Amino acid sequence: MRLLLQKTTFLLALALGSSAFAADKAPPPPSGDIWEHRLTDFSDSDYRFAVEQLFQDFERTTGHKLVPGAKKKVGLKIYADSGPGLATPFGLVRALIAALEKRGFEHQNIFLVGLNPLRLRLTGFLPSLATGVVPFPGHPVYVLESGKFYDPAWFYDSPLPSRFDPVTNDRAVEAAAGGKSTTTTEEDRKSFLATPLFLDADFWINLPVYTDHPVLGINGALVNATLWNASNTFRFFKSPATAPAAVAEMAAIPELREGWALNITSLQLYQFIGGPYFNSLYTVSEPHLLMSTDPVILDALMVGKLNEARKKTGFEPITEDDSRMLDYAAQLGVGSSDAKHIHWIHVDGATP
């Protein structure tokens, strides 16, 4: 299977029988629906009520029940890659766990997926080395950079230079190469996909947190599901010409999209400039929880919100050229890049 876009090539190498997905089963077309629920104080109970109301309305509106299937597992793709201060809220994660357990998922079959062990520990998703406190006892946390959750049959191929980390500026060669200090040219071309989300789970939910991004324009739903969800992807952050294409092509993988049920983001805190590094001086908080099956239109909405905040503080806006990955993703059928096409479903009657 191969997609070509801006000289970037997607290769999904499948060993015979390695996929649990039907090859002829296409993901549903994007709807443009965004569900919204107002929050009051960002407490656990606040999130729990909002998530349950959103789930009930989604199930009623679409006819799709968020219940266990044949695999009896569900994955939550968390975001921790801006470091302490800007990560998927714990209250939201606890609320989702409660809602999914209510629908029949067993405690141990709800797992979390994150990328970098240091940032997962600094943001509290992994136990503190000092206290050993586990934030989500009984729920596995899969750390992708451990190298344990990739399958050599599933990779994205691109002839870009080797990797670097846009947040810490440390080379991640050893971790991504299975402990080796050097890598071959062939290995450097490959970004291995995180298989637990689309091979082990009935479906998975994407939980992005929003920042701007100097190369991609917007760091949100699409990026959390792609470049923060595979090995050896930091290399793409070097090039504005190739990174948008890589995000769009990875997001268009049918097997990944088939189980990609929802994107849910809290506007408890988002950052409008200086990202993906966390900087509290450039953050905004709004009392809204947003949910959509369409990651592209959610990102398009947030580009507008980031630009509103930039305008108020005297910064230049994110342009269409800056965020062209949204157009690329729309061309590949991942979603709609035009925020004018949003169909709002205000579960509690509020308007963001």
Region locations from a protein language model:
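Positively charged n-region of N-terminal signal peptides that target proteins for export
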Residues: 1-7
